[in-house]
C-alpha cells in the first residue's frame, strides 16, 4: 500500500515545480523563484485558488456557508487575514513541493512505468466519473477548466504524489523499516507511547441498554480481582501470557464488532460470540443489521498507543508497570481493567488520537522525520516574487462569490488594456 505524504496541514496534494533557471533573467510569466526554480503565473494562481477553496470548505463545514470575508481574521490563523493565510499557505505548498522534487532528482530517482500507468488510469477514471462514460482527456480538461482547475497541474499533482511516495520510501522504507529500531524506540519512549493488553470486565452495559444490579456489579468486581490475582501469581512470563490470552478470550468484555444501525443510526457493539451466532440486532431499537455492516477490531494482542488514546486511568497505570507486569484491577468509566504492559513493537499499528490514519510506530517516526526535514529546508529556502509581482497583485481574484481564477493570458491582456 502506497503512503501519501502530507506536505502541509491544509493541503494533501502536492505541486511540482517545473523548469529551473539561472541568473536574473526570468520568463515573462514567472511570478516567484524558489531556490532558483521558476514558478509560473498559472502555477501560482492554481495553488492560490486551491488554498482559497480549502478555506471555503472550512467555512462551509462550520457555518454552513462557503462565503468568506477575505479581509477578516482567518479561523486557521488569527494573526492573518483570510487572504494572507491563502498567500502564506500557497507559498509553503510551493516551496515544500519544490524541495521534494529537488530531493527526488538529487537521489537519481525515477517514476516507474507502473507509476506512469497509474497516473493514466487515474486520469481516465476521473474523466469517466466527471464527464461520463467514454469521455476523453479533452473532455476532462474542459470540465476542470469550468471548476477553476488547470488540467496540466492536476496531472502534475498526481505525478508529485507518487514522487513524494517514492522519495519517502527511498529514505525510510514504505513503513519506516529503514530506520534503526533503537531510534524508533527512543522516540516512542520519549513521547509516551505504550504497548499493553488488557482484560476488561465491564460494570455497565456498553450500549447503555441494560442497567446492572448492585449484585451483578459486585460479582464482576470480584471476578476482576480473581483474574488479576491469578495472573499476578504466575512468575513465568510465557506461562503468564498464555494464561492471560485464555482468560481474555473467556472473560473480556471489550467489544470486537461495531456497526452503525440502519434503523436508529446509533453506533453499537457486540461480542464475537454473538456475531458468530448471527445475533446482529441493535440493542437500542431491535433492527437486524447485516453482517457486512460490522467492523471487526482485533485487539487480541492488545494496543500500542499514544497519550490521549485511552482513558487516563488506563494510560497512567500502563506507565507505572514494568514490562510483562500485571496490574491489579484498574477502575475506569468502562469497568475494571486487568492490564499487562508489553515491550514496544515498532511494526505494530498504533492508536494515535491526533493522527488521521493508522500507522506503525516506525512509520509514525519516519513521517515525523520527513516532515521535520521539509520544515527545516523550507525555513532555509530562498523565495522571492519577481517581475514586479507581490502578494497584493492577486487580491482582485478574491471576490465575494469566491476565488476567480485568471489565466496569465487573460491577466496580461487585461493589464495591457488598463495601461493604455
Predicted regions, residues:
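Positively charged n-region of N-terminal signal peptides that target proteins for export
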Residues: 1-7
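Hydrophobic helical h-region of N-terminal Sec-dependent signal peptides
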Residues: 9-14
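C-terminal motif of bacterial Sec signal peptides marking the signal peptidase cleavage site
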Residues: 16-20
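N-terminal targeting/tethering segments
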Residues: 23-149, 420
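PPIase-associated folding chaperone regions across multiple families
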Residues: 23-27, 34, 138-222, 273, ...
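Second-shell loop/turn segments in exported
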Residues: 29-34, 76-91, 101-110, 126, ...
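Solvent-exposed, polar/charged alpha-helical surfaces in well-ordered, non-transmembrane soluble domains
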Residues: 42, 46, 88-92, 97-105, ...
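Peptidyl-prolyl cis-trans isomerase
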Residues: 226-312, 343, 349
Amino acid at each position: 500500500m502506497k503512503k501519501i505524504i502530507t506536505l502541509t496541514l491544509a493541503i494533501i496534494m502536492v505541486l511540482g515545480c517545473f523548469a529551473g533557471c539561472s541568473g536574473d533573467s526570468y520568463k515573462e510569466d514567472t511570478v516567484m523563484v524558489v531556490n532558483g526554480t521558476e514558478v509560473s503565473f498559472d502555477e501560482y494562481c492554481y495553488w492560490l485558488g486551491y488554498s482559497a477553496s480549502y478555506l471555503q470548505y472550512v467555512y462551509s463545514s462550520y457555518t454552513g456557508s462557503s462565503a468568506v470575508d477575505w479581509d477578516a481574521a482567518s479561523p486557521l490563523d488569527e494573526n492573518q487575514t483570510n487572504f494572507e493565510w491563502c498567500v502564506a499557505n500557497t507559498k509553503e505548498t510551493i516551496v515544500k513541493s519544490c524541495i521534494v522534487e529537488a530531493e527526488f532528482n538529487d537521489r537519481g530517482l525515477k517514476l516507474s512505468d507502473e507509476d506512469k500507468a497509474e497516473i493514466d488510469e487515474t486520469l481516465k477514471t476521473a474523466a469517466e466519473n466527471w464527464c461520463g462514460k467514454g469521455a476523453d482527456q479533452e473532455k476532462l480538461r474542459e470540465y476542470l477548466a469550468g471548476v477553476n482547475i488547470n488540467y496540466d497541474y492536476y496531472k502534475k499533482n498526481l505525478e508529485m504524489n507518487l514522487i513524494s511516495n517514492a522519495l519517502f520510501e527511498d529514505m525510510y522504507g514504505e513503513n519506516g523499516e529503514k530506520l534503526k529500531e533503537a531510534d524508533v524506540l527512543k522516540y516512542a519512549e520519549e513521547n509516551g507511547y505504550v504497548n499493553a493488553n488488557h482484560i476488561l470486565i465491564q460494570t455497565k452495559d456498553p450500549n447503555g441498554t441494560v442497567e446492572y444490579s448492585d449484585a451483578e456489579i459486585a460479582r464482576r468486581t470480584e471476578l476482576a480481582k480473581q483474574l488479576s490475582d491469578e495472573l499476578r501469581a504466575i512468575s513465568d512470563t510465557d506461562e503468564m501470557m498464555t494464561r492471560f490470552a485464555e482468560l481474555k478470550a473467556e472473560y473480556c468484555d471489550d467489544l470486537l464488532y461495531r456497526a452503525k444501525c440502519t434503523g436508529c443510526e446509533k453506533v453499537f457493539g457486540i461480542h464475537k460470540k454473538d456475531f458468530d451466532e448471527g445475533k446482529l440486532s441493535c440493542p437500542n431499537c431491535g433492527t437486524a443489521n447485516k453482517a457486512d455492516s460490522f467492523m471487526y477490531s482485533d485487539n487480541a494482542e492488545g494496543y500500542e498507543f499514544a497519550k490521549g488514546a485511552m482513558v487516563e486511568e488506563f494510560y497512567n497505570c500502563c506507565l507505572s508497570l514494568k514490562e510483562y507486569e500485571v496490574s491489579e484491577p484498574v477502575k475506569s468509566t468502562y469497568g475494571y481493567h486487568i492490564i499487562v504492559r508489553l515491550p514496544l513493537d515498532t511494526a505494530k499499528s498504533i492508536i494515535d488520537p491526533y493522527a488521521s490514519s493508522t500507522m506503525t510506530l516506525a512509520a509514525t517516526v519516519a513521517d515525523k522525520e520527513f516532515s521535520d526535514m521539509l520544515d527545516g529546508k523550507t525555513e532555509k529556502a530562498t523565495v522571492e516574487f519577481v517581475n514586479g509581482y507581490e502578494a497584493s497583485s492577486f487580491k482582485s481574484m478574491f471576490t465575494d462569490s469566491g476565488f476567480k481564477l485568471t489565466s496569465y493570458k487573460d491577466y496580461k491582456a487585461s493589464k495591457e488594456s488598463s495601461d493604455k
